[in-house]
């Protein structure tokens, strides 16, 4: 999960409403009641670093395709229909990972004309709040189909397993609603669900939800510094030079997943990414000299890196954690965070990678390796940059999002089970 280029808003600093009341309050759009509840995500523990790695694992259970991890949508539409559809028989790009064209990275494709480069903010709904549902079920490892498109303006992806219940393909766009076929009507009578992935929280100056969250609400969602041990990160003694070290760029599809990575001390990439990182870990351990494996975290389409963590254990390919925003990541490994701050891409764009067609490191795919020389330069920039913000500022914001997502998933599961029971009775 990383890692494919990487994933789903009221917060615990003020009294939480009952789940039913929250959903009622969030149903601002005229179609909100038609959106099926379909989120799940697991156990929540203490603030960052207080929950042990692997505390909530379900190795024997496949997670449905999701992510989690939720950009806000504005939106425009063709005609009077604000929801876009892609036909069910639309050709798939056949990429190995549904969320990302390559591993966990979003990929440019020839379908950019399907995405909407414009936005409007007239009617807020679940989408704009970042609480969209229809998290995907796992038919196979990645779902029945796989495809990713990039609008050129924001990273987007098609929803998976949307063939169920007669649904056609539905697009998911990071910032904007997508253009629709046939004026918003596809091959289904039911409106498509779209999963939002948030690349930045309310700490960001370009956080796009002003009509729903006013300044006082956003202030209330800011993290109480006393709840997080900030002294554990950004230490002055962290080394800037290494005799041996390995560096990899990690691209997450949502800040929700990075939040949980810091909180639980674990990460998961795609099957290919997990194998690559696991091999690097064992190779580093076999080295006669100390050789740490560092992970440079960035959230897809965020325009920044969010920090640096160290891979401190091998991949457990049989353990699946339940708290990722998208329920599809198989396997996980422990990490230790050293630096947590927002570092803009502009500070790193001059560093180009020969092993990636001399592209800037900011244009890397998930698990892109960075050589020792460039990795050392990046560490120095990370340490020296005096950032005013970091993902820890939005701790309570993401905690509340996780609770809402989890409750919606539980409700959707219950509805699915109740529906299956009803069908069994009718057939008997």
Swiss-Prot record:
GO terms for biological process: calcium-mediated signaling. GO terms for molecular function: mRNA binding. Gene3D superfamilies: ph1033 like domains. Coiled coil: none annotated. RNA binds at residues 251-253, 257, 267-268, 300, 324, 329, 337. Expressed in root apex, shoot apex, lateral root primordia, stamens, carpels and trichomes. Keywords: Cytoplasm, Nucleus, RNA-binding. Residues 245-382 form the YTH domain. One of its GO terms (cellular component) is nucleus. The keyword RNA-binding applies. The keyword Flavoprotein does not apply. It is found in: Nucleus; Cytoplasm. Pfam families: YTH. CDD domains: YTH. Specifically recognizes and binds N6-methyladenosine (m6A)-containing RNAs, and regulates mRNA stability. M6A is a modification present at internal sites of mRNAs and some non-coding RNAs and plays a role in mRNA stability and processing. Interacts (via C-terminus) with CIPK1. This is YTH domain-containing protein ECT1. The lineage of its organism: Eukaryota, Viridiplantae, Streptophyta, Embryophyta, Tracheophyta.
């Amino acid at each position: 999960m990383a890692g494919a280029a990487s994933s789903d808003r009221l917060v615990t600093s003020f009294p939480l409403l009952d789940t039913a009341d929250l959903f009622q309050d969030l149903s601002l759009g005229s179609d909100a009641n038609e959106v099926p509840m379909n989120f799940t995500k697991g156990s929540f523990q203490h603030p960052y670093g207080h929950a042990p790695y692997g505390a909530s694992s379900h190795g024997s259970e496949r997670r449905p395709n999701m992510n989690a991890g939720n950009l806000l949508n504005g939106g425009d539409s063709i005609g009077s229909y604000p929801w876009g559809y892609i036909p069910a028989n639309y050709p798939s790009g056949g990429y190995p990972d549904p969320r990302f064209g390559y591993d966990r990275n979003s990929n440019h494709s020839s379908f950019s004309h399907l995405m909407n480069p414009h936005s409007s903010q007239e009617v807020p709904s679940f989408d704009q709040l970042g609480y969209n549902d229809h998290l995907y079920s796992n038919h196979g490892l990645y779902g029945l189909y796989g495809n990713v498109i990039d609008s050129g303006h924001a990273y987007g992806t098609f929803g998976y397993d949307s063939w169920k219940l007669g649904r056609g393909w539905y697009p998911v766009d990071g910032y904007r609603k997508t253009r629709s076929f046939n004026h918003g009507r596809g091959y289904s009578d039911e409106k498509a669900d779209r999963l939002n992935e948030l690349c930045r929280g309310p700490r960001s100056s370009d956080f796009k939800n002003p009509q729903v969250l006013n300044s006082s609400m956003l202030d209330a969602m800011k993290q109480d510094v006393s709840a997080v041990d900030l002294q554990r990160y950004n230490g002055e003694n962290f080394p800037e030079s290494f005799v041996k070290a390995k560096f990899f760029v990690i691209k997450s599809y949502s800040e929700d997943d990075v939040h949980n990575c810091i909180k639980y001390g674990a990460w998961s990439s795609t099957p290919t990414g997990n194998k690559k990182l696991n091999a690097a870990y064992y190779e580093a351990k076999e080295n006669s000299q100390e050789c740490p494996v560092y992970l440079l975290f960035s959230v897809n389409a965020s325009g920044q890196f969010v920090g640096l963590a160290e891979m401190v254990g091998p991949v457990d390919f049989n353990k699946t954690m339940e708290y990722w925003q998208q329920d599809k990541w198989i396997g996980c490994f422990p990490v230790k965070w050293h630096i947590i701050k927002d570092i803009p891409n502009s500070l790193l764009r001059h560093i180009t990678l020969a092993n990636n067609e001399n592209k800037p490191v900011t244009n890397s795919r998930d698990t892109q390796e960075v050589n020792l020389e460039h990795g050392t330069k990046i560490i120095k920039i990370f340490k020296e940059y005096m950032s005013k913000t970091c993902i820890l500022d939005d701790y309570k914001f993401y905690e509340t999002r996780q609770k809402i997502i989890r409750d919606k998933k539980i409700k959707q599961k219950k509805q699915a089970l109740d529906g299956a029971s009803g069908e069994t009775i009718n057939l008997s």
